Amino acid sequence: MSSRPILDAGPGLNFLALHKERLLFSAVGPLSAPACVEEEILRKAQADSRFEAADRVWRKLSERLMSVLPDDPTAELERAVERISSLPLDERYQRRRDLGETMVVAHAAVAADRGVRMIVLIDDQWGRRLAAAEQRRLERLRSNGRPVGRIDLISTTTVLERAAGSVHLPDRASLRALYQRLRTLDDGLLPLQTTGLLDLPAWNRH
């Protein structure tokens, strides 16, 4: 059993601010996001003109494409947040720094503990380390015979790799242009030449 991938604010802001939501959904399908990630996207879009378009795009997304996961306390979510952050959910929620990444991983962990295969879309290195720690925990449980799911970790690079050769990203020139724009929004993205995206087999079909 699988569920919608869970989106962190960073990739969401970047793709939506550039009006590349069709590329995003064509690559990964319908998405979900914790309530705090929705809040972060809208807050940053209103505060930083570079992300202004993300506000309008987000508000137009239908439930079919984007569902918001409530961050209301449940026993499972509270356990996951405390395990991941070493803080109770209510206290962690008051500390806004890296909250989105924490809640993305926590929601995925709750579903994975129920046997669901989850995907999380995170670029932030700290958030990816959180997800990797949960991956290892689930692997240990599986090795002990527990019927748990798993968490797969993807990134902006994964999205672009899946979109390569499509109408949204037909050739290397379009990739270079888009990646340059993405890096103006997120200086944490690796230089294009180090990602392997320029060497994908998809380009050889054009």
Q: Residue locations for each model-derived region?
A:
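Active-site-proximal, substrate-binding regions of enzyme catalytic domains
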Residues: 2-118, 125-206
